[in-house]
Amino acid sequence: MLKLIIPTIMLLPLTWFSKKRMIWINTTTHSLIISTIPLLFFNQINNNLFSCSLPFSSDPLTTPLLMLTAWLLPLTIMASQRHLSNEPLSRKKLYLSMLISLQISLIMTFSATELIMFYIFFETTLIPTLAIITRWGNQPERLNAGTYFLFYTLVGSLPLLIALIYTHNTLGSLNILLLTLTTQELSNTWANNLMWLAYTMAFMVKMPLYGLHLWLPKAHVEAPIAGSMVLAAVLLKLGGYGMMRLTLILNPLTKHMAYPFLMLSLWGMIMTSSICLRQTDLKSLIAYPSVSHMALVVTAILIQTPWSFTGAIILMIAHGLTSSLLSCLANSNYERTHSRIMILSQGLQTLLPLMAFWWLLASLANLALPPTINLLGELSVLVTSFSWSNTTLLLTGFNMLITALYSLYMFTTTQWGSLTHHINSMKPSFTRENTLMFLHLSPILLLSLNPDIITGFTS
């Protein structure tokens, strides 16, 4: 694991010692090279000695998320260049340092073998994210968004710390492998039920589950482009990863406790999708589907079958790339029109035809059209939820219909129609932006050729 962690840490001195003209080139090229390192972890059988140590290790569940995290850093750096063009050099370097330190803490969170270490790095991701939102956001409401983000996450994760301390006192170890192999089955008592809630609540806030999701639209809307990309693509996946790791340890208690949360996630999925149909703010319309898609992931994880786990992992990777792509497209609109209101940026297809092509592909990926990897994830979750209960097909099917409606609504509102009067002149789409969209879309399409590499430890 050090062959991924050390090069990422070395990006920090590279950033601070780079000259003004070379800072973007250096950080982008080096982070792109680093993003290829997790490819070595996909061959788990032969290379297991190289990707496993006492504090850090990778397995088929961790590796796709590590790959997503590493792949996203060069994309966030590329997307932020216009946003930071008027900032002094020291602030550019500080911004890049925040992104790199966030990547380091995410890599360590995903690869930690001790649960207390996992908790520490899980909380560490808050600090750079909060700094990015509150310092580099565009509107004054960013401070309110930062407060929501901080308090929801901290209050949700405090019971997790108490549960971890209790587990360590009773069992004497918090090693994930040891707990998976040695723990006895938990009986269905009040104390154990409370412990299950304490373990999972932090991750349900992070996912977020419907009802605990109020921080996400605020943080997503007020964050700068890199903050929105990382928040949607990777930070929400921390919740899914934590739930998948810990619900295996907490079996068979999960089967008893899952029903209310399954119902809440299925209901929340419909509600948040319906909210999207009434949105006028483009970034808000991109933020709310994250709650809807993550509700599907919560459903898949709580059903606790190998196929549902596979669907959850695929859906997390697919949603990470798609949501990040939509955030980039919304940012490209915002940089030209200086407004997030969709009606004020309508008719852009006539001015930016290539960008309209990216918008079409992103919208189709969002509604899980073949040959995207999103389709495979949604189908896996759909089939497993149907085998768990037939009535879920009505809810999930209705959700897919609403998803198609708001995806096409987003595309038609921003691209079609007559141009508004305040748009007199507009810069064309840059090569940097087109490259950024291509680097988002190519994994979504290419993974559908060989989805085995991200199906997790169930394959």
Curated annotation (Swiss-Prot):
Keyword entries, A-Z: Electron transport, Membrane, Mitochondrion, Mitochondrion inner membrane, NAD, Respiratory chain, Translocase, Transmembrane, Transmembrane helix, Transport, Ubiquinone
Pfam families membership: Oxidored_q5_N, Proton_antipo_M
Enzyme class: translocase
Transmembrane segments: 22-42, 60-80, 94-112, 113-133, 145-165, 196-216, 224-244, 257-277, 284-303, 308-330, 351-371, 391-411
Keyword Transcription regulation: no
An annotated Gene Ontology molecular function: NADH dehydrogenase (ubiquinone) activity
EC nos: 7.1.1.2
UniProt subcellular location: Mitochondrion inner membrane
Membrane topology: Multi-pass membrane protein
Catalytic activity: a ubiquinone + NADH + 5 H(+)(in) = a ubiquinol + NAD(+) + 4 H(+)(out)
UniProt main location, coarse: mitochondrion
Cellular component per GO, a single term: mitochondrial inner membrane
GO biological-process terms attached to the record: aerobic respiration; electron transport coupled proton transport; mitochondrial electron transport, NADH to ubiquinone; mitochondrial respiratory chain complex I assembly
Subunit (UniProt): Core subunit of respiratory chain NADH dehydrogenase (Complex I) which is composed of 45 different subunits.
Role played: Core subunit of the mitochondrial membrane respiratory chain NADH dehydrogenase (Complex I) which catalyzes electron transfer from NADH through the respiratory chain, using ubiquinone as an electron acceptor. Essential for the catalytic activity and assembly of complex I.
Family: Belongs to the complex I subunit 4 family.
Protein's name according to its UniProt entry: NADH-ubiquinone oxidoreductase chain 4
